[in-house]
């Protein structure tokens, strides 16, 4: 199970120190997943089958992230460990994304809670990927005694595989 962390860090922050600066969260993630740090400039090399999290490593990256808005994974899962003002940047970015109709979520807080949420998001991602290309349908109509179910009937359209 691999997580691709698309890292955004301030130009003032040396890329070489990114790992050591965020050792606590990266080590915890590596207990459960293979973690690959991907520079934001290389995010186009990832495929639609790769589970991606946007890693806000420092503050001061808000403009950089929005410049790459079209290339960001959807929904946007933002990971911020609070180091180097990353949480403030993640909050700004999330607000901007939501203002443009893009779903986003910030992962921040106690490490066990972050890991638990990543597990859920990863499993949801895998389930959604397994449904792409599948034909899903309902045969017949609900029985008349299922009065609440009648209002829930609708056609489910899955987005095309990216």
Task: Place the predicted regions along the sequence by residue.
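Glycine-rich beta-alpha loop elements in corrinoid/cobalamin-binding modules
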Residues: 106-115
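Metallocofactor- and cofactor-centric catalytic cores in central/energy metabolism, strongly enriched
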Residues: 1-91, 98-100, 116, 120-123, ...
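Glycine- and other small-residue-rich loops at beta-strand/loop junctions that grip anionic moieties
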Residues: 82, 107, 141
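Solvent-exposed, charged interface segments at domain starts and junctions
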Residues: 44-48, 148-153
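Beta-rich, aromatic/charged-enriched effector core domains that present basic-aromatic interfaces
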Residues: 110, 121-127
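Conserved anion/nucleotide-ligand pocket segment
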Residues: 126-152
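Conserved thiamine diphosphate
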Residues: 95-107
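Conserved small/polar residues in nucleotide/adenosyl-binding loops
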Residues: 153-160
């Amino acid at each position: 199970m691999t997580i691709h962390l698309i890292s955004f860090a301030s130009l003032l922050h040396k890329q070489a120190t990114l790992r050591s600066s965020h050792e606590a969260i990266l080590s915890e993630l590596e207990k459960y997943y293979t973690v690959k740090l991907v520079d934001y400039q290389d995010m186009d090399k990832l495929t639609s089958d790769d589970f991606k999290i946007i890693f806000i490593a420092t503050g001061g990256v808000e403009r950089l992230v929005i410049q790459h808005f079209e290339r960001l994974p959807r929904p946007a899962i933002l990971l911020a460990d609070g180091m180097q003002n990353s949480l403030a940047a993640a909050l700004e970015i999330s607000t901007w994304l939501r203002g443009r109709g893009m779903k986003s979520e910030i992962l921040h807080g106690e490490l066990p809670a972050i890991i638990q949420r990543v597990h859920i998001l990863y499993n949801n991602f895998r389930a959604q990927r397994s449904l792409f290309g599948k034909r899903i349908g309902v045969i017949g109509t609900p029985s008349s005694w299922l009065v609440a179910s009648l209002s829930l009937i609708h056609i489910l359209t899955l987005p095309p595989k990216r």
